[in-house]
Structure formats: C-alpha cells, structure tokens
Amino acid sequence: MSHKMNWNLITKRIATSSYLLRIKNVWIFTFFLCSIIANAQQKTYCNPVNIDYAYTPFPANTEGGKHRATADPVIVNFKSKYFLFSTNQEGYWWSDNMLKWNFVYRRFLLPKSAYKLHDINAPGVFVMKDTLYVYASSHEKDFPIWKSGNPTVDDWHIATDTLKVGAWDPAFFYDKDIDKLYLYWGSSNEFPLMGTELDTKTLQSDGFVKPLIHLEETIHGWERFGEYNDNVFLMPFIEGAEMIKHNGKYYLQYGAPGTEFSGYADGVYVSEKPMDLFKYQNHNPFSYKPGGFARGAGHGSTFQDNKGQWWHVSTLAISVKNNFERRIGIWPAGFDEDDVLYCNTAYGDYPAFIPQFNTGEKLNQMFSAFTGWMLLNYQKPVQVSSTLGGYKPNFAVDEDIKTYWSAQTGGAGEWIQTDLGEVSTVHAIQINYADQDAEFIGKSLNVYHQYKIWKSDDGKKWTLLIDRSQNQTDVPHEYIELEKPVETRYIKIENVKMPTGKFAICGLRVFGKAHGTVPNEVQNFVAFRSDPNKPGERRSAWLKWQQNSEADGYVVYFGKSPEKLYGSIMVYGKNEYFNTGLDLNDTYYFQIEAFNANGISKRSEVVKCD
C-alpha cells in the first residue's frame, strides 16, 4: 500500500467522525433532556407509596407466589424529617419531603430473639424529648426498646432490655404537656385494646393495665368481618392502636375489621383523659377507602408535617398471592371546627401535592391535596409485546390492583402501550409493577427497575419521553411527574430490566386532562335503607343512580350531617353501591359526583337516609 496520504479517505473519515460525534451529542442531549423531564423538582406523589418494599420473609406465605408485603405503617416527624416504619422491612425509611424516601438497613432483632423472621412487626414508634424510640410487637422478654438521636443512619442503642408488660400492635404516646408516657396495644377478635402508663425513665409499667375500647359490630356496620362486612366465619379484629392529642383531647385510633379487606379502616374514640372515658366519635371510620384502584385505609398513624398540617398513613390491601400482601398509602387529614378528626381519601390514589407545595386550603371543609389531574386511560385500548396465560392486557388499565397483565418474560424489549383515545394533556404516569414469578424472600438490596417511556400522537411514530434505562433504584410503584405537561395520545412502557420475575403491570395509569367536557350532574340519586321501626339490616344502605354515559366513575360522599360529608367511596363503571359500613341507629346523608378524563361534575343534591 502506498504511504501517500489518501485525502479522499481522510476526508470521508473526518466527515464520518464528525457525524458520529453529532449523533453521540444528540443522544447525550436526548438522554439528558429525558432525565430533566423525569427528575425536576417533583411536587406530587401518588398512592400506593413508591418505596422499595421487601418481599414476604415467610416461606409459608409464598404458596401463591413470592411477593412484596408490608403493613401497619407509622410515620413520625422527628427533627423536621419524616421517619416511616412498617412490618417486616429489615429497616425503615426517612424523608425530608414525604416524596423521596431513603432506606436505612437495620435488623432490630437480637441474636437470641425467638422471632427469627419477624424483625419488627407492627412497630410502635414515638418521640420523647430529643430521642426517637422503636419497639416491635412482642410478648417475649427478648425484644428491647431501641432509641436513637440520629436515625438517618444506623445509630441505635438499647433504651431498655425488655418491655415487661409486652404488647402486640404497640402504640406509645408521650404527652409533653404533662411529661407522661402511655402505651396502648392489642390485636384480637376476643380482647379489647389495652392501655397502661409507663415510667418515662425506666420505660416500664407499674403493672396497672386497663381495658379501654372494644368493637361493637352489632352497631357499627364497618366493624363487621369480611370483604363486604358479610363474612361470619370469624369475629372481627380490633388492632392497630394509635394515640394523638388535639386541643386538649385524646384521640385513640384503632383498625378493624381485618387487614386483608378493602373496607379495612381506622376508627377513633375521643376523651379528655388519656386512659379513661373514651367515646365513639360521631364520624367513623375516619380513615376509610373501600373503592378505587388501591383499597383499604386501616391500621395506620396520624402525624403532622413541618407546616403543622395533619396526615394519615395506613395499610392498603392487595391480598392476592396471600392475605397479607399489602402496601402503604398516605392521605391528608385534619380536624374540623368541632374537633372532629377526618382523613380525606377522595381521589386518594390519584396524584396529590406533597406538604412543601400544598397550600393547606380546604375543599368542602376538608384539607385536600388532590391536584385535579384525572385518570386518562381507564379501560382504554392496550397493546402488548406478549401475554402470559390468563394475565390479560386490559388488566393493566381496569383500576383494580388485584388484577394484572404479565408478559411472557422479564426480558428487555417487552412492552405495553395504552391509547388515551384522543390527544390529551399528560402531567404524570404511574407504573405499578406486579409480582409474577418473583424469586426473592425478605429484603433484597441493590435491585432495580429499568425502563423507557415513549409517547406518540398516532401510535406509529414514537418519541422518547422518559429514559430510566440507567436507573439504579427499586421502584415497584413508580410515579413520574413531568416537569412540563405534554400533549400526546399514546404512552408506551418498554422494559429494560426487572429486579426479578416477569415484566408484569397491575396498573399503568396516565394522569392529566383530556380536552372534552366533564360529565353532567348525576341524576336520580337515591338511598334505600331498612325502616327503623321494621325488621331489617340498618347497618347497610343500597345507593342507586342513573348511569351517566359520559362518566368513568363516581365518588359517593357520606356522613351523619349534611355539612360533614367526610366519608367517600369511589365507584367505577356501575350505577349502584351497597354501603355496608353504617352505624345502626344514626341518620346518614349522601351526595354523589361523576368524573371522567376531563374532570369532575357538579355534586348532586344531598340525600337524607333515616
């Protein structure tokens, strides 16, 4: 070969290199832009809470398939940071903003503990002065109360070797006004919730234990056992005690009737004393979410953010692979002018503002964090790369966390796309992964989801919207708020990597606003209930209304006063609902609104139901 310079070849190589450099720069810019879209300061969250849930640690609970599980959450505000503890996670989370949760791996069990798998079950967490304390459900003498002044890292010390009185589902309450510490506990379908005072120095009881409250399911319909409060093979459970204080009153909260049910809820008794004379609050259950995508709102805790606004965190039920397959949800809460405790679960699995960006304004007398972004793809057409058996594609858009679509593999390139029906304004996307053929038991560290999100106006020409192909975090309920809303009709999720198992989705949910009209006001809304002077079931009411062809669903509001309709139930695609959660002897009031991808209708007139 000649050693003369081949200027034509050199020119071609220079041109090619320049072209490749431009392509590389375009790719880098595109990746950077997609990351900016996904990672700009996020103002909203969406239930279920997107944290790296552990898998069940119990082999006996995996006969229906290995799966993620937790429950019984407690959030405390300590030194202006939020600390989240829940059942069997081999650690806990902390956050500055209730959006980004940082996991701290920590085994609280001592080597000698009789519970080798439980770690912490239904934890009791409390702040006393400048220290955070943690204790787990135990009647053994080998589980200590732990303490930390710096819990953002694994820096814990034993406060006392054992809690001699023992407690399952413990709840501690330090009353700083009088410098006293109390313990409440119980999880039983036979025994009531118990209470005792603890010495603030020894953290032990003097032995005086007092029964405080018990279920009255013959009066309170929502306390009856079963998915529809109709299952008689077991008596209902009272559990999940929690205590807060407001305006000099003590609010003793409890969960019922069973953690696996959509109607799992938190009720509350109120007293002017921490250990006596508790009365059933007129508005009960105060935390209740039997409808929608993610259902259940029981065994939780109520806490204040850094602005002083109240929130409630509770257990969400999935209960497919096992009764104890569960997640966590957070909702705005508060007290009205009469000191009535409420939790606002209306649209409670749609995007909501985190505390930093919430104005604290009230809607219909309740604090609301709802963004107003609607679900754009309910029961809309779906296409997928493959399908595993009976796990059909449309299960990903049916607004039921219990059903899911699964691809045949968990490999890169599997995909699912949803058609919004028309070009719409998209603000946020939630990807709820399901556990199909998962291989993990217990906490799995250093695992992650990787994916790409594409958008299209015609379903043919696609533009990359979000690139998480390099993501290094575990995001089982991934929620992405776009920095700027986009106009599009089709959304596609392309799998890059799963932590384990198949690429499976129980909820591909696209939020924003369509460009049509909101539904008309619901017509012919009626409520039927047994006459108080005749035999019949007065703990239930049959609600009916005229089907609205423009509506995707409805939200029914209810309460015992037309001015205090604090309870809510979301109903998709039906024109009736059997409300089985009423109190026997009280008059109720109901109101309904319709919603679709465009927004929410005007509310109906209030209906009285004696």
Segments the model singles out, each with a brief description of its role:
Residues 194-206, 360-399:
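Predominantly extracellular/luminal regions of secreted and cell-surface proteins
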Residues 469-472, 568-574:
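Short beta-strand segments within Ig-like beta-sandwich modules, predominantly Fibronectin type-III
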Residues 511-550, 584, 598-610:
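Pro/Thr/Ser/Gly-rich low-complexity, intrinsically disordered linker/stalk tracts
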Residues 486-488, 551, 585-587:
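Extracellular Ig-like/FN3 beta-sandwich strand-entry sites
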Residues 454-455, 550-569:
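Extracellular low-complexity, O-glycosylation-prone stalks/linkers
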Residues 579-600:
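Beta-strand-rich modules
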Residues 398-466, 476-523, 534, 544-546:
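Aromatic, loop-rich ligand-recognition surfaces of beta-strand-rich domains
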Residues 41-233, 245-292, 307-309, 315-360, ...:
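Beta-rich carbohydrate-recognition and catalytic domains
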